[in-house]
Amino acid sequence: MENLLKIYDIKEEELSELKALTPARICVGRAGTRLKTNTFLKFRADHAVAMDAVWSSVDEKLIDTLNFLKVQTLAKDKEEYITRPDLGRKFSEETLDYIKNNCINEPDVQIIAGDGLSATAINANLRKIYFVIVEKLKSRGYKVGTPIFVKYARVATMDKISEELNAKVTIILIGERPGLATGESMSSYMAYESSTKKPESQRTVVSNIHNKGIPSVDAGKEIVRIIDIMMKEKKSGVELRI
């Protein structure tokens, strides 16, 4: 460690400040050619957290408490969801009919939550961010759609739901592929008139939503700010200047 600091002319206090800003492994040092024991054990523990985030399930009580309509993609289980990403983007015709018949049609903003690759992220962040988004949207006079929870969801599920309900802006709050220190990281993908006929570049993203990244409450405020711009400009993704 001392050799690294000398080589790169880094002061100890500067390194401490950098480490305080990120959970990433910075200047962890080595014991000979191997990682130090504490570093190796922390790596194994963080890897286990990431694995748990992928294979865990979203708390059903949380979804029920927030009154989300619950649906599932064509993926039968978690293993198929992981090995067949295409099935996580599709719904059966029965499910699409169920969505259309049980949700508000033509909303200004349609909110979706999906487990994605980290159910842990949804469990940790959904409650706070959802209330912030809904409260601020309604205070601005937007017609907010029936919230929908999608089990075994990929981002593209937002396109099918948007088309079915004819939503102006659709957002999906989804658990992201976990890193070694960010098992609770969630992202919000947003699009104006989201459609399966449009490219992925139609989407605007707010990512890294978790306590050590962008806190849920702050992320919720930023999401609504972006939605305001989308509604005004009638576009999203790479076409939108935010």
UniProtKB/Swiss-Prot annotation:
Recall the taxonomic lineage recorded for the source organism. Bacteria, Bacillati, Bacillota, Clostridia, Eubacteriales
Q: What class of enzyme is it?
A: lyase
Question: What residues does adenosylcob(III)alamin bind to?
Answer: V155, E176
| Metabolic or biological pathway, per its Swiss-Prot or TrEMBL entry | Amine and polyamine degradation; ethanolamine degradation
Tell me a Gene Ontology molecular-function term this record carries.
Answer: ethanolamine ammonia-lyase activity
* Quaternary structure and partners: The basic unit is a heterodimer which dimerizes to form tetramers. The heterotetramers trimerize; 6 large subunits form a core ring with 6 small subunits projecting outwards.
Q: Which reaction does it catalyse?
A: ethanolamine = acetaldehyde + NH4(+)
Family named by the database record: Belongs to the EutC family.
Per its UniProt record, the required cofactor names are: adenosylcob(III)alamin
Compartment(s) where it occurs, according to its Swiss-Prot or TrEMBL record: Bacterial microcompartment
Q: What does this protein do?
A: Catalyzes the deamination of various vicinal amino-alcohols to oxo compounds. Allows this organism to utilize ethanolamine as the sole source of nitrogen and carbon in the presence of external vitamin B12.
Per its record, how is this protein called by name? Ethanolamine ammonia-lyase small subunit
EC number(s) on record?
4.3.1.7
GO biological process terms, alphabetically, are: amino acid metabolic process; ethanolamine catabolic process
- Keyword Cytoplasm applies: no
List GO terms (cellular component aspect).
Answer: ethanolamine ammonia-lyase complex; ethanolamine degradation polyhedral organelle
Query: Which keywords fit this entry according to its UniProt record?
Result: Bacterial microcompartment, Cobalamin, Cobalt, Lyase
Protein source organism: Clostridium acetobutylicum (strain ATCC 824 / DSM 792 / JCM 1419 / IAM 19013 / LMG 5710 / NBRC 13948 / NRRL B-527 / VKM B-1787 / 2291 / W)
